[in-house]
């Protein structure tokens, strides 16, 4: 199934679908640009585009009225909820991108220490495609859809995830920019 068909299936509300599509398209375009500028990484561009378009599909389940999300779950769960949706659709590889893109990825230690309402397991990007999509996502917000963040703005938005997340982001800057 094409990513847009899945988005239409799970996100029938027009305003939310518009937000999701603009954000996801921006992330996909940046991720594809990174992959194309770094052919030595051998990233699967078709998968990057599909997975980037679907990485935030779980927002349809969360309570975030500022971005037209009127579900019942906390926003922090949008990655794992999106992964559940994609697993039901038979898209395991895409599901991993969903659950591993929060911050620069979440460690089991972070999940436990912060008491996050998430499965107690490592949820950090592993494959090069997961890393590229996670990195590209840090440059775009769902509240300022027409603006790409600078590296410094993206870093500031990651401060809440701690020094480990910032170090990973900085390493990705060196590798991908």
Language model segments and positions:
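Active-site flanking loop/helix segments enriched in acidic
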Residues: 2-23, 61-71
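Amphipathic alpha-helical segments within well-ordered protein domains
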Residues: 7-8, 28, 32, 82-87, ...
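Divalent metal-dependent catalytic cores for phosphoryl transfer on phosphate-bearing substrates
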Residues: 12, 40-147, 151
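Charged phosphate-binding loop/patch that engages nucleotide di/tri-phosphates or the phosphate backbone
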Residues: 158-177
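Hydrophobic packing residues in well-ordered alpha-helices of helical domains and bundles
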Residues: 20, 24, 75, 166-169
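Active-site hotspot residues in diverse enzymes, especially metal/ion-binding acidic/histidine motifs
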Residues: 1, 5-7, 146-147, 151
